[in-house]
């Protein structure tokens, strides 16, 4: 989805910015003009950050790049809408790369992220937990800087993780909307990478003696338990408990850059039951398909 008109919250709140429409949003990952690109090669770094920003964050198998480094007063948008059917927490990771012309918020390249309710209003609007807006002139001390050549300056934001508790939106539609745009004067561009995932609001684990309960990476943590008086609260990402422990542990997960934004995960320790372990071998034999199951000795 590419703009004719896309509103920029960092510019005049009473007006809109206008951009040249382009009917070709994607032209392939090897083309500098590509606007919607799937990145799946591990260990690749973005050259416009001095090869310091991973194009795929740790623990992920792929990412999507929205936008390109070309200028021309253009804009791109990706919108994803889905039905919340389970007790889920939405996890999004994003990184931003923008040229820095120093024009000011109203004219600079821009990246926006919004997570919206079914009626279009922002989720967690009071704390702004489901939105993020960036331009080079906004909070300049929070950017990383790279100047590859005379007259070209880039700012970039390393991978950041946000999480939204969707349990109260169960049965509703949720919309995720990301926007990138060039500077309005036509000479500078920008783009962003992102990944998207959902996890259960209950952390479950199984084992024989002790089990590890681990919260998602990219946050601050506070584990606590109201039932087990011997348990000492901790700020580690994970805790180890006995396999027979049936009490419920809770982890308060807080954004790194927005301390008012958090969600709480609960735990469930599941007893370990014996399971068969085998490899499957598939062969095509004339018109027949043969499957072989080979037991693995433990």
Short names for language-model regions:
Residues 1-200:
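Aromatic (Trp/Tyr/Phe) and Gly/Pro-enriched flexible surface segments
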Residues 196-298:
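Proline- and Ser/Thr-rich low-complexity, intrinsically disordered segments
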């Amino acid at each position: 989805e590419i703009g004719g008109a896309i509103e920029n919250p960092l510019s005049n709140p009473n007006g809109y910015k206008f951009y040249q429409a382009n009917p070709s949003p994607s032209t392939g990952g090897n083309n500098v003009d590509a606007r919607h690109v799937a990145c799946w090669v591990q260990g690749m770094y973005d050259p416009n950050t001095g090869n310091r920003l991973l194009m795929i964050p740790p623990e992920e198998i792929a990412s999507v790049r929205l936008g390109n480094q070309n200028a021309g007063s253009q804009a791109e948008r990706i919108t994803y809408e889905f039905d919340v059917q389970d007790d889920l927490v939405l996890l999004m990771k994003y990184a931003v790369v923008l040229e820095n012309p120093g024009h000011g918020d109203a004219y600079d390249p821009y990246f926006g992220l919004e997570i919206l309710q079914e009626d279009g209003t922002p989720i967690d609007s009071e704390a702004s937990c489901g939105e993020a807006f960036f331009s080079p002139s906004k909070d300049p001390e929070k950017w990383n800087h790279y100047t590859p050549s005379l007259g070209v300056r880039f700012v970039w934001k390393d991978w950041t993780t946000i999480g939204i508790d969707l349990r109260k939106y169960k049965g509703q539609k949720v919309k995720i909307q990301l926007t990138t745009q060039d500077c309005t004067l036509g000479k500078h561009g920008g783009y962003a990478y992102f990944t998207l995932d959902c996890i259960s609001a209950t952390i479950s684990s199984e084992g024989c003696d002790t089990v590890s309960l681990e919260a998602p990476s990219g946050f601050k943590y506070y584990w606590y338990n109201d039932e087990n008086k011997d348990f000492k609260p901790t700020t580690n990402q994970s805790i180890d408990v006995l396999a027979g422990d049936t009490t419920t542990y809770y982890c308060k997960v807080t954004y790194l850059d927005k301390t008012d934004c958090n969600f709480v995960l609960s735990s469930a320790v599941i007893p370990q039951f014996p399971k068969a372990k085998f490899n499957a071998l598939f062969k095509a034999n004339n018109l027949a398909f043969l499957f072989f199951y080979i037991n693995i000795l433990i």
